[in-house]
A protein has these predicted regions:
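C-terminal RecA-like lobe
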Residues: 546, 831-874
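Alpha-amylase-like alpha-glycosidases and glucanotransferases acting on alpha-linked glucans and related
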Residues: 2-26, 30-36, 68-74, 79-106, ...
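Catalytic domains of carbohydrate-active enzymes, especially glycoside hydrolases
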Residues: 42-65, 341-353
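Amphipathic alpha-helical
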Residues: 776-795, 873-900
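C-terminal amphipathic alpha-helical interaction region
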Residues: 807-808, 822-825, 908, 923
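Flexible loop residues that form catalytic
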Residues: 62, 359, 425, 825
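Carbohydrate-binding surface patches
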Residues: 875, 905-926
Length: 926
């Protein structure tokens, strides 16, 4: 008789099964899913992608998102596919088609936040109904004990267009009934009322009905019985498990009973609906809203003017977006609920790899990536069937297995069974933590380095002078970024800064050594150190094993902050330094030590949004010297990439992260690769650029408006506009059509609001925005300007095409997995989202690929023809098709190949970069 299989053996078998089908993509193709591009649309694309040489389809988020979502990053239900994308049958048909062609499916996963303020998010609705006693209260990162007393045990909902009292008395907040449940509505938004507050409404109805129906009426008796049940519910502040279970059970029974009563008793229904109508008040009679005000004040949430969010919001958000609430996947039950369906897809082989969105928002990214891999193993074991025993024992066995593998392995490919890449933005010298259980980043580090190769670094001083002279100011990138961080922390993310400051102040009260530090002082040093941190975040999770990387960046931030603030006590900076590095744990009681670690983890979740909002979404729209460099993950203050630095990055990638993704355009980039390739040309023609600026400024001076006695747009925004126009002007166009005009207006309005100099999304200046819109239109309508502009544009466009083809070839040949963003296999002159989500003409791309196949025997002739007509984009598709075919024919060169920089000699040496790759007796030179 065979002995039973041990849990350890089952783990080993599951890992072996996953490893056997582990896919490292050969090349990925990113598709943006929405109601206009569904699973069926993607299925129709598969033969084209396969013919092009794509190995893995890469999908944007596919789980159920908020109604109307155009991007899918506002998931409201992780247990369902997004119905606007199609059915399960549609998705399975897509997965089957990929499998038939030996293609994989890489899925974009959003574990940091969910879309809320919509009834499609049942977890959030339950929190609004039940407050801290909701089973999902710990799913979201809510501070139920904020400093403001009125918000204790309540969540702030900053959704109102005006002050609460104004909105209330305008009659825009209305109670409605659905069956036996009550809600408050505000336009399309609908929030549940807590059952604790139902008696307020039902008691008066019962009293009124007694006179009409008589005390002995059975329906009135049932209503009073329901009232008693509701009054005996555990309050929403009672968080004991048994009370939560009782409340969840009994409130639903009470609502069902009320719904049944209303169906059989027209008098009760009529009386209740009349009471609701009275409760909703009459505009013009402020006192008529008093009862509704009392009812709303009894809810586990507080409706508020949207501007209140910056100062008082008490749930963690994705950046400053109120409609995206952070979730706590560090809690095992939350992780399982969020990833359950995803892991079933992985175990079944429907999904073969993952892209993780915004990992820097997570409590402990390193632990999360490890948990992803372990969860894939557990899901595989469950799918294999049989008795898996105790879940905790299984989890422990999986962890022990990987611990042993880590201790004995030399190659990470031998350890982790699931291909995972992370949307991690690295600074120029910042390494990706080597312990993370993944294959690398999504490629912004490559984008930055490769993009910079096409900028002439020797022209930096000249270009800086041109920029400074034109805008009549000398801007310092680091100073702008620092000030932008301070600004963001005093506006959009003020409430987050206040929350972690309060957290630390409460900790200091537990130590006689530190209790004299004031809240104001602590908030000040947290703000200054955060503003001085040169990276998105650190990854400290325990006093043991703090990396040299994290220690270096914390110490550097503290030193820089102290230097900038000589008037602030050094004791405060020293305390914060020791706290962030967990050096002072022994000076606190054990319970306080846990809170101190929690503060450090919260601070690390805070610094990433500060960096993103202040640098990517503010400074990048202010410092416009050469906006080809103003890209996600890039460093505009560094004018180009020296070839040695590019080679070093590739050497490090082939050694540490050989399967990391390589990106040149994404759904998040500020400009497409082709736009950046054009704008980079300006660095090689500074004299011509300066002369053009002078002519265009003179031609267009009269087209500006006047705002606050100053010309609008200002010269910095004008400088940005000319670069943008050169970047996006359609190939072969002799005038701007309405589509281009609308795109440029939309972009410039977004740019000036993101810059936050003259206008912003929070405080819009309509006069300035109207001046910008008018300027764009008048410039494009001016035949004299267009006539002067076109020769410069054509020259820039020609060399931009050369740049883009070279960049494309680099992406397809250096170490890593090349990713192609939808449509960029031919020229695509797109700007920031939503401009980069415009429809792609796949019929045109298929026709060009068919032409290449049809004339395959004359590749040299094709190359000459396409190069001679490069403006039509066929040359780019030809380069991609040729390079991907070469990759497929020589997989070892790209999976295991070495990377060796080559010295370039000759007159054009400074314009060339070369390298060799070797593996298994094969070699190639680029």
């Amino acid at each position: 008789m065979d002995s039973p299989v041990t849990v350890e053996e089952r783990v080993a078998q599951a890992v072996e099964a996953l490893q056997a089908r582990r896919r490292v993509p050969h090349a990925t193709y990113r598709v943006q899913m929405n109601e206009n591009f569904t699973f069926r649309d993607t299925l129709a694309l598969v033969p084209y992608l396969d013919a092009l040489g794509i190995s893995d389809l890469y999908l944007s988020p596919i789980f159920k998102a908020r109604p109307g979502s155009t991007h899918g990053y506002d998931v409201c239900d992780y247990s369902e596919l997004n119905p606007v994308l199609g059915t399960w049958e549609d998705f399975r048909a897509l997965a089957a088609a990929l499998r038939e062609r030996d293609m994989g499916l890489l899925l974009d996963m959003v574990p940091n936040h969910m879309g809320i303020m919509s009834e499609c998010n049942g977890w959030w609705m339950d929190v609004l109904e039940n407050g801290p006693s909701s089973p999902y209260a710990s799913t979201f990162d809510i501070d139920w004990r904020p400093v403001k007393r009125e918000l204790q045990n309540r969540v702030l909902l900053p959704i109102l267009e005006d002050q609460y009292g104004v909105v209330l008395e305008d009659g825009k907040l209305r109670v409605v009934r659905e069956g036996g449940a009550f809600f408050v509505t505000y336009y399309a938004a609908r929030m549940p009322l807590t059952p604790d507050s139902y008696p307020t409404l039902l008691a008066s109805v019962a009293d009124d009905l007694e006179a009409a129906l008589g005390e002995g009426d059975e329906h009135l008796a049932e209503l009073r019985s329901i009232l008693t049940a509701l009054r005996n519910l555990p309050p929403y502040t009672d968080t004991r498990p048994e009370s939560i279970a009782e409340r969840q059970r009994e409130k639903e029974i009470a609502k069902q009973r009320l719904a049944s009563l209303l169906e059989v008793s027209p008098p009760v229904q009529e009386a209740l609906d009349a009471a609701i109508a009275t409760l909703n008040g009459t505009p013009g009679q402020p006192e008529s809203f008093d009862a509704l005000d009392r009812l709303l004040s009894a809810q586990p949430y507080r409706l508020a003017f949207w501007r209140v969010a910056a100062d008082e919001i008490n749930y963690r958000r994705f950046f400053e977006v109120n409609e995206l609430a952070a979730i706590r996947v560090e809690q095992p039950e939350v992780f399982d609920a969020v990833h359950g369906l995803l892991m079933e897809m992985v175990a079944e082989g429907l999904v073969t790899g993952l892209r993780i969105d915004h990992p820097d928002g997570l409590w402990d990214p390193g632990a999360y990536f490890r948990q992803l891999q372990e969860s894939a193993v557990a899901a595989t074991i469950r799918r294999q069937g049989g008795d898996i025993g105790d879940e905790r024992e299984l989890a422990a066995a999986i962890r022990a297995y990987f611990d042993a593998q880590i201790a004995g392995a030399e190659d990470r490919d031998d350890i982790w069974p699931l291909y995972v890449v992370a949307e991690k933005i690295l600074s120029e010298t910042e390494p990706l933590p080597a312990s993370w259980a993944l294959d690398g980043t999504t490629g912004y580090d490559f984008l930055s380095a490769a993009n910079g190769l096409f900028v002439d670094g020797s022209a930096e001083e000249r270009f800086t002078e041109i920029y400074s002279r034109f805008i009549r100011a000398r801007l310092d990138f680091d100073r702008i970024a620092y000030n932008a961080k301070l600004f963001i922390m005093s506006t959009a993310l003020s409430s987050e800064l206040q929350a972690i400051s309060n957290q630390l102040e409460r900790i200091t009260e537990d130590s006689r050594r530190y209790r004299d530090f004031t809240l104001s002082g602590l908030r000040s040093v947290i703000r200054e150190v955060t503003a001085s941190l040169p990276i998105y975040r650190t990854y400290i999770s325990s006093p043991d094993g703090i990396s040299e990387r994290d220690q270096y960046f914390v110490l550097r931030a503290v030193v820089d902050a102290r230097r900038r603030n000589p008037g602030t006590s050094r004791l405060l900076f020293s305390f914060l330094r020791d706290t962030l590095l967990l050096r002072n744990l022994d000076q606190f009681r054990p319970a306080t030590r846990r809170r101190l670690l929690s503060f450090v983890m919260s601070w690390q979740q805070f610094t990433g949004p500060v960096m993103a909002k202040s640098v990517e979404d503010t400074t990048f729209y202010v410092y416009n010297r050469l906006v080809a460099l103003n890209e996600v993950g890039s460093h505009p203050e560094q004018f180009g990439t020296p070839p040695d630095a590019f080679h070093e990055q590739n050497r490090m990638r082939v050694e540490h992260w050989p399967h990391a993704m390589l990106a040149t355009s994404t759904h998040d980039t500020k400009r497409s690769e082709d736009v950046r390739a054009r704008i980079a040309v300006l660095s090689e023609m500074p004299d011509e650029w300066e002369a053009a600026l002078e002519r265009w400024a003179a031609l267009n001076a009269s087209k500006k408006g006047t705002v606050d006695d100053e010309p609008a747009p200002d010269r910095n925004d004008e400088y940005l506009f000319y670069q943008t126009l050169l970047g996006v002007w359609p190939e072969g166009a002799t005038a701007a059509d309405e589509t281009l005009r609308a795109r440029l207006v939309d972009y410039m309005l977004k740019a000036v609001n993101e810059a936050k100099v003259h206008t912003s999304w929070i405080n819009p200046d309509d006069a300035y925005m109207q001046a910008v819109e008018g300027f764009v239109g008048r410039v494009l309508d001016d035949a004299a300007f267009v006539e002067d502009f076109l020769p410069v544009q054509r020259r820039v466009a020609f060399f931009g095409r050369v740049n883009s083809l070279a960049l494309t070839l680099l992406k397809l040949t250096v170490p890593g997995v090349p990713d192609i963003y939808r449509g960029t296999e031919m020229w695509q002159f797109s700007l920031v989202d939503p401009d980069n989500r415009r429809p792609v003409d796949y019929a045109r791309r298929q026709a060009v690929l068919d032409e290449i196949r049809r004339r395959g025997d004359d590749r040299a002739g094709l190359a000459r023809e396409f190069a001679g007509h490069s403006a039509d984009g066929r040359a780019k598709l030809y380069v991609i098709d040729t390079a991907l075919a070469f990759r497929k024919a020589h997989p070892a060169l790209f999976r295991q190949g070495s990377y060796e920089p080559l010295a370039v000699r000759g007159e054009a040496a400074e314009h060339a970069v070369g390298f060799a790759r070797r593996a298994n007796g094969e070699e190639m030179i680029v």
